[in-house]
Amino acid sequence: MATLLRSLALFKRNKDKPPITSGSGGAIRGIKHIIIVPIPGDSSITTRSRLLDRLVRLIGNPDVSGPKLTGALIGILSLFVESPGQLIQRITDDPDVSIRLLEVVQSDQSQSGLTFASRGTNMEDEADQYFSHDDPISSDQSRFGWFENKEISDIEVQDPEGFNMILGTILAQIWVLLAKAVTAPDTAADSELRRWIKYTQQRRVVGEFRLERKWLDVVRNRIAEDLSLRRFMVALILDIKRTPGNKPRIAEMICDIDTYIVEAGLASFILTIKFGIETMYPALGLHEFAGELSTLESLMNLYQQMGETAPYMVILENSIQNKFSAGSYPLLWSYAMGVGVELENSMGGLNFGRSYFDPAYFRLGQEMVRRSAGKVSSTLASELGITAEDARLVSEIAMHTTEDKISRAVGPRQAQVSFLHGDQSENELPRLGGKEDRRVKQSRGEARESYRETGPSRASDARAAHLPTGTPLDIDTASESSQDPQDSRRSADALLRLQAMAGISEEQGSDTDTPIVYNDRNLLD
């Protein structure tokens, strides 16, 4: 048996191990297409600001081809460094594209104010054609989808500080798009707006240079469809992280935005580790979780072997990302989601509608959190030197805190309760039909008698005993239906008062002409 277990562990490790690169074969290269990237040919701030202005106009042109749009975006992304050409050549290693750098300098003879640097060759016409200044129709179209403030005609500046602020504002809006361009483009607008408000409050961006929605949609769609552009952006992030010492302000802002980009598309894997394993609830000892715990261990080792590109595997379209999906550990993932919904209010908005979602293990996670509230881990307490008296004090405080949190009914536990009017009879209520209808009426009658004879506390227990137990919970309402025992008791008392008042009103209905209306304050006081 011991040999079998060792073989099983070795099999799991080798199964999830990435392929070993061998030196016998060469690298597989695809059919490359050429991307032209304009870069400043001198150190003048005027040249850089004018190039930035022309590239922003170019991206807003709806007639721009995909490779040309990618080259313009790469040119903008590399404008904040001192030598953009060296940066692009150092970090670019793409088997699908071949990048050609074109140095741009100022020119008074071209309509765009720029020309391509060359030795004795007039390149003004080519520069105007590239920046779409040869056709007046396309020139007018290039102004659409630019800044929300229509009073801004251009962004050419002379001082480095002003240029860095404008460039940083534009770059922040581009980098934020990468966070959900691949994983959730339909719901990206709200999170992008929150990031924009954050950086505006921190004075990292200038609010007047907010780009139009259509311009941002064009860039988001290009990021989503062009893997080469995403490879360049990830390589630039990693290059900035490797830079020692103090970094430029724009580089620090890119690293800050990276916190929203990193591990995009890996929420199931990360949250399962966070809520399913790190919480260390005793439910992990179930036999059902043994195989999936071994799978998660292998995936964590594989994640570390992938190195610095592991958090970006979904953005880089790495085929190994499928191993990290929740379908590889459905029971443990369902349990972790139940734990997460109880511990964090932000988890209540997640979509659990997956084919492999198991409501039973979801409720197991919820119940595990509720019944373990206020308990102190003996292992952790011994490591921290917490005495038994301190542990009891912590448990008491934690229990009061949990009760206060439940009484406020925050997050996914908040349920909507509809109250009856005095003139509404049982015949007007929605009919369940058959045995369920008779069961509900019987439970109501028993609850009223129990309330009148024994009081609200024992009546609530009698009502709880007649609750149906065979009905499965809906996925979206699982967290609302399962309440804490004390919270359920309060709700039961309130509903029993409601039913009692409704019964009294039915008996007095013939004597009174005006129906009695009860609100929540009268019922719950």
Curated annotation (Swiss-Prot):
Region: RNA packaging and organization of the helical nucleocapsid, residue numbers: 1-375
Segments of this protein annotated with the region Ntail: 404-525
Tagged with keyword RNA-binding: yes
Biased composition (Basic and acidic residues): 433-452
Modification after translation: Phosphorylation at Thr-279 is required for the formation of the nucleocapsid.
Keyword Disulfide bond: no
Purpose of the protein: Forms the helical nucleocapsid (NC) in a ratio of 1 N per 6 ribonucleotides, protecting the genome from nucleases. The nucleocapsid (NC) has a helical structure with either 12.35 or 11.64 N per turn, approximately 20 nm in diameter, with a hollow central cavity approximately 5 nm in diameter. The encapsidated genomic RNA serves as template for transcription and replication; encapsidation by N is coupled to RNA synthesis. Forms the encapsidation complex with the phosphoprotein protein P. Before encapsidation, the newly synthesized free N protein, so-called N0, is chaperoned by P.
Domains: entry comment: Ncore is globular and carries regions required for N self-assembly and RNA-binding. Ntail is an intrinsically disordered monomeric domain in the C-terminus.
Protein name: Nucleoprotein
Organism: Measles virus (strain Edmonston B) (MeV)
Gene: N
